[in-house]
């Protein structure tokens, strides 16, 4: 498996049900993909059997379904895939009979605050939040205007005083979240402003906010800031493996097979007509891919497709 997000983890679990062993690679420092790295505490409401579940709990549950012998290699970006008579060789080291690519939106990194900062300032500028409680009883600035910024501001407001700064008067996120923010007494909305300068003064971040249009500039002081300008995602490296892309996504057939026999894909990395980017859909695609692999590797076997077979 290439990708240790929710779809890659579930693919390894489903492979185990069919007697297949898996090795999982991920370029990130820890398992879980975007749910773990980008919104670990956000409630996800479109996973079957859960009214809601946060990203961390979802990943923990998926990890608990893996057999003990499943090996996961993090901090490793697969650079090379070669096909031979026995299957595939990844980075001239690992031999695999088949491959499932489940890299989601691809390798991603945050869009950074476009200001020059000294090291002692950068330590107080965050692009990922693991635990909102770490910001308890502090003055926090949140920069951004999309759903991620709104979600972060709402969650942080449970523990801290928050000011959310956006360059437009209108937010791009859900109106329900905007109304929620406006109802909180410890949240202040500052629009339309852009950050112009940042300094560390009296152990606080002193930020110059440039007013847009005829709005006057102002200074704000924070203990820490959180930047939610979005992320740059890139799947173009997959093309180096000889995989056919549809834009930046992998073109697959109904069995989740790519243009290369033995290489499959599942999750948000794939493209086909009518697809919607849902984790739950990726789980089903992983099951299709594993079932297809079993039929390729063991054509003589009669498969038990699912655990509810009678």
Swiss-Prot record:
Record's protein name: Ferredoxin--NADP reductase
Gene3D superfamilies with a match to the protein in the record: FAD/NAD(P)-binding domain (3.50.50.60)
Free-text comment on the cofactor: Binds 1 FAD per subunit.
SS bond partners: none
PANTHER family for this protein: THIOREDOXIN REDUCTASE 1-RELATED-RELATED (PTHR48105)
An example Gene Ontology molecular-function term: flavin adenine dinucleotide binding
Residues that coordinate or bind FAD: 26, 34, 39, 78, 108, 268, 308
Keywords, comma-separated and alphabetical: FAD, Flavoprotein, NADP, Oxidoreductase
Family per similarity comment: Belongs to the ferredoxin--NADP reductase type 2 family.
Top-level EC class as recorded in UniProt: oxidoreductase
Catalytic activity: 2 reduced [2Fe-2S]-[ferredoxin] + NADP(+) + H(+) = 2 oxidized [2Fe-2S]-[ferredoxin] + NADPH
Pfam families, sorted: Pyr_redox_2
Highest taxon of the lineage: Bacteria
